């Protein structure tokens, strides 16, 4: 994705990494704030995949970047995650998913809505390959891990579905092009 956004759309990309086990969301937000503060650019866009979208949601709730830009979530379960809920109830997995995943996906405490002035684009996949095939039964289109309805955050600017799996969206040229389109123009290209 980084390579495609750079080569096809001219973006300078920076990757922020974090661990979901043993870390509280507040720690990750503090680290992200320091990371963003070191970026020397007039405009800063954000792209988060899966739980990364929720990290960005919490970041913009508490410490929004002062520089202008747009935000895209890729396959982020903004409402709740049936897969995480089901996996989190199994004793063998509950200790592996980490506190942050549990708090944000299994038992979120607050109804989420995008209240940030930045434009937010949401991309959901419809190719059902992933954990969701084994744990929850989806009665809707899904990317194999997250249902399309789980990606819809009230207050978003635009939402698009693409025929990709949850992990496959990271390597998809079509997803990268839609991300580039939204970051550049605040809308997705019509399919």
Mark where each language-model region is:
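Histidine-bearing beta->alpha loop at or near hydrolase active sites
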Residues: 18-23, 163-167
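Serine-dependent carboxylesterase/thioesterase catalytic core
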Residues: 5-6, 12-16, 23-119, 138
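The serine-hydrolase catalytic nucleophile loop
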Residues: 1
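Anion (oxyanion) recognition and catalysis
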Residues: 6-7, 153
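C-terminal catalytic-base region of ester-bond hydrolases, centering on the histidine
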Residues: 117-191
């Amino acid at each position: 994705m980084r390579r495609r956004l750079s080569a096809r759309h001219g973006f300078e990309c920076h990757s922020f990494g974090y661990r979901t086990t043993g870390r509280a969301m507040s720690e990750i937000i503090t680290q992200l704030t320091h990371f963003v503060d070191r970026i020397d650019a007039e405009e800063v866009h954000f792209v988060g995949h899966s739980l990364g979208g929720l990290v960005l949601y919490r970041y913009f709730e508490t410490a929004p970047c002062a520089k202008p830009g747009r935000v895209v979530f890729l396959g982020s379960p903004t409402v709740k995650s049936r897969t995480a809920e089901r996996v989190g109830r199994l004793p063998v997995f509950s200790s592996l998913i980490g506190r942050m995943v549990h708090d944000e996906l299994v038992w979120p405490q607050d109804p989420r809505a995008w209240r940030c002035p930045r434009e937010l684009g949401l991309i959901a996949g419809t190719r059902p390959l992933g954990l969701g095939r084994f744990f929850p039964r989806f009665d809707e289109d899904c990317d194999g891990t997250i249902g399309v309805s789980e990606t819809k955050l009230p207050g978003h600017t635009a939402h698009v579905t693409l025929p990709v799996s949850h992990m496959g969206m990271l390597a998809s040229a079509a997803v990268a092009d839609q991300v580039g389109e939204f970051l550049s123009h605040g809308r997705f290209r019509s399919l």
